[in-house]
Amino acid sequence: MRTLIERLSTVEGLEHVLTRFTDSCARPYNGSIFENNRSPYHLTCSMQAVAYFGVRGDITDVLPRIRAAHIANWGPQVSEGVDLPHAGGTVTYALTYHREGGRCPDGRLMSAPTLEAPGLRIDWDRLHMPLPNRVEEPAACLPVESGCIYRRCSTVPDAPMSVAAARTRYGTILTFTLGGWGSTAYHYFTVPRRK
């Protein structure tokens, strides 16, 4: 996770603001007495990170640089790493969204753009678009809940600038989320249930 965040940090036009790391282990949900969806695991552990960046300049200048950094193949692609035309989750779609003002030629709203790859997602402020998005401040670190055995939450740097202050400085905030389904950090440690 740190390596990918560092690679994104080297993209011209992005300034790292903060990263929130979460590591937790829990007993899987096995449903109610009326459901038969017993997990094959007794314990699962997963990590997630959300890195916040200030965008210097226009996001449409930065998106091609993110693609050129080869952090992931963003969205569906055809041969030789070319984005599938009109496919969501790609840099090409995101650039078209901004160029067209978030509307199809017939006036319909386009779906909001993000960059997506297995276990990775990039999103950003789109404050003046038909489907606005505003990156929020990171949520407070949650306490250990029932079913959760362990949770560690940390922020780097220890005393970061707020997202609101970063937005005032840079104009646009971008988030890079790592973890979840498709990530090597999802269920990175499991304890199988004995049969």
Task: Give, region by region, the residue ranges found by the protein language model.
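An acidic-aromatic pocket/loop used at catalytic or ligand-binding sites
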Residues: M1-N30, V55, A68-K195
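N-terminal accessory/precursor segments of enzymes
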Residues: Y29-S39
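Acidic/histidine-rich, surface-exposed loop or edge segments in extracytoplasmic proteins
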Residues: R38-Y52
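Stable alpha-helical elements in mature extracytoplasmic
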Residues: D58-I66
